[in-house]
Amino acid sequence: MLVLTETSVGFVVFKLSSDAKIDNKDLWKEFETPEGANKALKVQAIQRFTSTASAVEDLTAVQDGRLTDSLSRFLLDTVGGADDGEKKKKKKKIEEMLVVSDPKLAGTINKALSIPVLSDSSTQDLYRGIRQQLASLLGGVDQKDLNTMSLGLGHSLSRFKLKFSTDKVDTMVIQAIALLDDLDKEINIYAMRVKEWYGWHFPEMAKIIVDNIAFARVVKAMGFRTNAVTTDFSLLLPEDLEATLKSAAELSMGTEISDSDMTHIHSLCDQVISISEYRTQLSEYLRNRMQAIAPNLTALVGELVGARLISHAGSLMNLAKHPASTVQILGAEKALFRALKTKHDTPKYGLIYHASLIGQAPQKLKGKMARMVATKAALSIRVDALSDADSRSDVSAAEVGISNRVKLESRLRALEHQAGIQSVRKVVSANGQQGRQQPRFEMSGVTGSYNAATDNVPLNGDLLPTQPATEEVKEEKDEKKDKKKKRKSEVAEAGDVTMDGDADLSMVAGETKEERRARKEAKKAAKAAKKAAEESGDGDKKSKKRRADEDEDSEKKKKKKKKDE
């Protein structure tokens, strides 16, 4: 049985003696001494590394489970077998089995060279003993020299792995964009605290200076508001704002604060200024990193949006594996699953919405623009992820992203022209200055007054709620009464209406009063006779029940008397 071992010297194949069996539980005892190790194993063949570069290349391939050309030739010469070109030819049967430490490499050797291999947990004690007595097994090699070679090869292998790590730059971008978001939150919190704190002393200043960083710099330079007249703000503010600030400081209605209060406010202003300066440096660092790792994506959607996409996907390679439809809604997963659950429309964009190409599109065309930008972004990401590092550092590295951006801008103008929509992009005048700028806030001091005349509600007929109803309503009621009387008189002229419980209404025409009275009396007599007959029958039933009840009561009374006696 042969044993393949990779060392810092090279690849070594040992011959395992017949006395030392690999399935023996006491195999480790054979390697307690150098003599026992040399008795159990003999060097069959050795292939030394020619240089450190070749050693790093071969060991990296072995760790990945790949078979290099040099190792393949060495095994064919030492063990035998057949390579891909000689598999069809007859070869002598290989009786020796090769022991390999890595199961993945063992499968590759068996498949490529048709060599029977063994790689399982039973070989661990064997390789542990080989590493322990390696210097004596190789013969003529000093242990110190072997340790030095192992250390140098380990350093070279580590540098090689770090150099070709595909995620190392991605990690820097992910951490940078996360820190940038945290700094924005911190600056906002500290700046709001400065405005609230200093607002007790100079409340009008918050409306005059809107920018947080400029506010902190002005507070740091001015101190108390009484120093505003003698302080030079030419390096911090324009002339009109400086004049407004000084005039407002003279008429301010803020309270007075102590020197210790101003000291703490100044220290907080220093924090705001220092964090903002570091944020500027971090933003420049992120821009340079994105230009180096993904120049085409940066040219298409910008460094911030590109960095957020990479951070959300985990790495540039993971982002390159996503289709354009996933890139389009990346970051809107919660809205997507909620829409699928409720069977509503799915979102049209996610993080890519903040790209300038989508932001300058009209609201009606944002969805279509997001789809086109995602398509071109997916192509740019794949170009950046799969291109060489040298080509990404070239001047023309962002050519794909720039050309796609130009195409998308022209396509957006064409869509706006077809839809008849005016462009919402920034208008630039002939002298290069931006048109339609937002006007600056000015404190006019004019307050609006309340118009009480708008509270009047006009009523019909100009009547107050307390006035009585009009004569038209009274006339309407009188007409209803007259109609009612008229209907009654018509009924009386036509004849009386008789009500019968068993029959419908009937009118007897030509009947005199005496006949009508006699008919009514006859009806009453018939009803009385019927009622008397019913009562007589019920009376007999009731009398029987009464007698039965009385008999029961008498019996109960007798029983009670007997018990009492």
From Swiss-Prot:
It comes from the Eukaryota. The keyword Ribonucleoprotein applies. Residues 471-481, 531-541 have a biased composition (Basic and acidic residues). It comes from Cryptococcus neoformans var. neoformans serotype D (strain B-3501A). One of its GO terms (molecular function) is snoRNA binding. Gene3D superfamilies: 1.10.287.4070, Nop domain (1.10.246.90). It is found in: Nucleus, Nucleolus. Residues 293-417 form the Nop domain. SMART domains: NOSIC. This is Nucleolar protein 58. SUPFAM superfamilies: Nop domain. Residues 519-530 have a biased composition (Basic residues). InterPro entries: Nop56/Nop58, NOP58/56_N, Nop_C, Nop_dom, Nop_dom_sf, NOSIC. Belongs to the NOP5/NOP56 family. Its main location: nucleus. GO terms for biological process: rRNA processing. Required for pre-18S rRNA processing. May bind microtubules.
